[in-house]
Amino acid sequence: MGLSLMLLASCGGGGGGGGDSDGGGDVNSDNDTTPDVADQTLPFDYPPLDLSKIEFILPLGGMIGNHVTPIDHQYYVAPDFGANETIVIDVYSPAAGRVSSIQHMGNFDNDDYRIVVDHSTTIQSIYIHVDSLADKLSPFAPTNGQYVNTDIEVAAGEIIGSYSGSVDYNLVDYDITLPGFVNPDSYTAEPWKIHTPDPFDYFNDTIRQTLLAKSLRAAEPIGGKIDHDMDGRLVGSWFRENSNGYAGLDPNNYWLGHLSFSYDYIVPDHIIASFGDYAGEQRQFGVLGNAPDPADVGVSTGLVKYDLVSYEYYDGATPWDRSSFTQGMTMDNYSFIDAVVLVQLVEERRLKVEIFHGQTSADVSAFTDDAIHYVR
């Protein structure tokens, strides 16, 4: 597995917010995704970390392993990620605020912290996989696997910790509700998720240009996108019927009921079919022919067959090494078919699905009694 894919897979369950949820004041559900310029914290005049030391930024929206639906945080990756990891990178508070919580993630042998900084009543910065805390924060550090609420004032640009390898960052803006989640009630387990826009738009132009130049994604929004739902269409994320939405039925494997027909986070014209339960595993595939576009599949379309295939990223004519910076990548599917998945939108928000392992679209013509229903 490539380094960047190992990186995604290593980020444990809970998504960008991770751990315990953090409220963010009043929620405005007007679907306006433009930052509120009247907010005196904006634009941010400091980056989230020392950008001069990173190799690249993995944008929002990746899908890998048990991250079945698009990931709600970015990854800021050092050049030596996965090697000796001797490069230490400072993490900053991009604007003045208060550290409202610190969590020890407890997933690894070394210290691994999640930090939430409230910049206003509605805007937060969230970091995961911070290796060490700044002196101001370290007296409040929880023990392994624990979580503490705090109220620690930090200045704009103040160092709050450091990391080696990679850190997760996302921004939450509770004044914004992303329009590509057609049923926000399915995300109550991670309430920040529907309020997680592209962070790049929140920084001053000088910093924003540096962020844009470091992202592996060349298409707008360059910082990534996690909301792909269209009402009455296949595209976007789904949850197995009666499985409690994003939360699932078991917090230890909440992703089992997840399903997504979305777009790749780096090359967004490439369709990704992402499964929380693919013969007991969590798997992602391209679809043979990269068609039909799930945005074009509606109730009137009827039965659709997707042949599931592996895929590769290309930097020019060469497969991307998954560890060095580049932009303008393309993707290509392999020809070997792992399975065929049948899908049919039986109602605008109800989807019928069945996977036929080891078979192709030529082998299968109809659902069996093993078909499963998913809802938004």
Predicted regions and their residues:
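C-terminal motif of bacterial Sec signal peptides marking the signal peptidase cleavage site
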Residues: L8-S10
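Sec-dependent signal peptide recognition
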Residues: M1-S4
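Conserved, short, structured surface segments that act as functional micro-motifs
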Residues: D109-H119, T143-D227
